[in-house]
Amino acid sequence: MAVPKRKTSPSKRGMRRSADALKAPTYVEDKNSGELRRPHHIDLKSGMYRGRQVLEAKE
């Protein structure tokens, strides 16, 4: 069984745990419709992505 040679310092333990926290999702305002959407995602209401029509708009 593996056993650590040294005690993990509180600083190292905290740095390891810093990635475990849940982060709130980010949203950006869509330029065309003004709706909130996730960055780098298609606006599902208008079907636009980066100024191009990639899906048919939902009614």
Curated annotation (Swiss-Prot):
<dbReference type="GO" id="GO:0015934">
    <property type="term" value="C:large ribosomal subunit"/>
</dbReference>
<feature type="compositionally biased region" description="Basic and acidic residues">
    <location>
        <begin position="28"/>
        <end position="44"/>
    </location>
</feature>
<feature type="region of interest" description="Disordered">
    <location>
        <begin position="1"/>
        <end position="59"/>
    </location>
</feature>
<keyword id="KW-0687">Ribonucleoprotein</keyword>
<protein>
    <recommendedName>
        <fullName>Large ribosomal subunit protein bL32</fullName>
    </recommendedName>
</protein>
<dbReference type="GO" id="GO:0006412">
    <property type="term" value="P:translation"/>
</dbReference>
<dbReference type="GO" id="GO:0003735">
    <property type="term" value="F:structural constituent of ribosome"/>
</dbReference>
<dbReference type="Pfam" id="PF01783">
    <property type="entry name" value="Ribosomal_L32p"/>
</dbReference>
<dbReference type="InterPro" id="IPR044957">
    <property type="entry name" value="Ribosomal_bL32_bact"/>
</dbReference>
<dbReference type="InterPro" id="IPR011332">
    <property type="entry name" value="Ribosomal_zn-bd"/>
</dbReference>
<keyword id="KW-0689">Ribosomal protein</keyword>
<feature type="compositionally biased region" description="Basic residues">
    <location>
        <begin position="1"/>
        <end position="16"/>
    </location>
</feature>
<dbReference type="InterPro" id="IPR002677">
    <property type="entry name" value="Ribosomal_bL32"/>
</dbReference>
<comment type="similarity">
    <text>Belongs to the bacterial ribosomal protein bL32 family.</text>
</comment>
